[in-house]
From Swiss-Prot:
Species, as recorded: Herpetosiphon aurantiacus (Herpetosiphon giganteus)
Family per record: Belongs to the TRAFAC class translation factor GTPase superfamily. Classic translation factor GTPase family. EF-Tu/EF-1A subfamily.
A Pfam family recorded for this sequence: GTP_EFTU
List of residues binding Mg(2+): T26
Domain tr-type G: 10-209
Superkingdom as given in the UniProt entry: Bacteria
Protein name: Elongation factor Tu
Function: GTP hydrolase that promotes the GTP-dependent binding of aminoacyl-tRNA to the A-site of ribosomes during protein biosynthesis.
Subunit structure and binding partners: Monomer.
GO annotation, cellular component aspect: cytosol
Length: 400
């Protein structure tokens, strides 16, 4: 069957659900697709379809990231359902890095939990520009004063981590109520909170200014072989435009730079003439084997970015209370540096006269990675150790 062409008639926004495990992120995602489907603006995706990798079902927690799409009157949304479990925060980082805005899901009976804090902190680190809160399971709360208290606590928490806590819309509702409703009338009360939430997302999360005019760059998230067609890499275009036929370079995870041409671009299984900044696309590459490319590399306009191993870094080291280290580290410390879509081990050098770094410190250091990756001034990264984030940083200067 011939593929449909993707219609670009509304602004496109990448959004995602974040929050503590079992607070209702996946239920809400399903409820949004259901409510929008009743208005003819989405395909309904059931809970099981979103929570769909094999290991997820067995343990009842979302591990991988699911993509759904829906529309409101004003916009087209690509929605990622981000993992909520602390062990899988690494995936959370890959998801949060792809967001123009986030829906923070908080269970009203439970209030903010450790992962709620960690996700707000991470959203700040990876610079999610705006957030809307869905206060879920309010049907399980009888006391309106308790609801007010949970809301106040949330606003304080958001403010603490650098978000405008007083301004952020908090929508109260029940995702399960909407998902379980037998009614096919979208104006019924059980769908009201979902409509309100989408209105808040439409109004409060700004349409991002896409970096369309900058040179093309796309971090590679995944690589597939398609029989008879070649190798496809997927990811979200960080900046610029890629057109079918463009020559591009594959950079990172080693010193060599490969040159290839893009022979096809797809989004949501539909063909595009070009992919633009902010689009989640698959790009078909000419003459490239499945083994020639890997997650962590980038596709880029020739000459626009180079692989580097050594740079200066301005780093904030998380406190113990924020989920960071309990003890200091010293020169020669070798954590993982989470750059764009992958972890790379690197050694840290501290400035002269600084013997150790304490949790909570802000410090400038030098970093030397064990393999070159595509790095440029202003690049943000996370520092991770044993599966948890211990710091966040930015590259003010490249050394080598």
């Amino acid at each position: 069957m011939a593929k449909q062409k993707f219609e670009r008639n509304k602004p496109h926004i990448n959004i995602g659900t974040i929050g503590h495990v079992d607070h209702g992120k996946t239920t809400l995602t399903a409820a949004i697709t259901k409510t929008m489907a009743l208005r003819g603006r989405a395909e309904f995706r059931a809970f099981d379809q979103i929570d769909n990798a094999p290991e997820e079902r067995a343990r009842g927690i979302t591990i991988s990231i699911s993509h759904v799409e829906y529309e409101t009157e004003n916009r087209h949304y690509a929605h990622v359902d981000c993992p909520g479990h602390a062990d899988y925060i690494k995936n959370m980082i890959t998801g949060a890095a792809q967001m123009d805005g986030a829906i923070l899901v908080v269970s009203a009976p439970d209030g903010p939990m450790p992962q709620t804090r960690e996700h707000i902190l991470l959203a700040g680190q990876v610079e999610v520009p705006a957030m809307v809160v869905f206060l879920n399971k309010v049907d399980m709360m009888d006391d309106p004063e308790l609801l007010e208290l949970v809301e106040m606590e949330l606003r304080e928490l958001l403010t603490k981590y650098g978000f405008p806590g007083d301004e952020i819309p908090i929508v109260r509702g029940s995702a399960k109520g909407a998902l379980d409703s037998a009614s096919t009338d979208a104006s019924q009360p059980e769908y009201q909170s979902i409509q309100e939430l989408m209105q808040a997302v439409d109004d409060y999360i700004p349409t991002p200014e896409r970096a369309i005019d900058k040179p093309f760059l796309m971090p590679i998230e995944d690589v597939f072989s398609i029989k008879g067609r070649g190798t496809v890499v997927t990811g979200r275009i960080e900046r610029g435009i890629v057109k079918v036929g463009d020559t591009i370079e594959i950079i990172g995870m080693g010193p060599d730079v490969r040159t290839t041409a893009v022979t096809g671009v797809e989004m949501f299984k539909k063909l595009l003439d070009e992919g633009r900044a902010g689009d989640n696309v698959g790009a078909l590459l000419r003459g490239i084997e499945r083994t020639d490319v890997e997650r962590g590399q980038v596709l880029a306009k020739p000459g626009s970015i180079k692989p580097h191993t050594k740079f200066k870094a301005e780093v904030y080291v998380l406190k113990k209370e924020e989920g960071g280290r309990h003890s200091p580290f010293f020169s020669g410390y070798r954590p993982q540096f989470y750059v764009r879509t992958t972890d790379v081990t690197g050694a840290i050098g501290l400035p002269e006269g600084v013997e150790m770094v304490m949790p909570g410190d802000n410090i400038q250091m030098t970093v030397e990675l064990i393999v070159p990756v595509a790095i440029e001034q202003g690049l943000k990264f996370a520092i991770r150790e044993g599966g948890r984030t211990v710091g966040a940083g930015i590259v003010p200067e490249i050394i080598a």
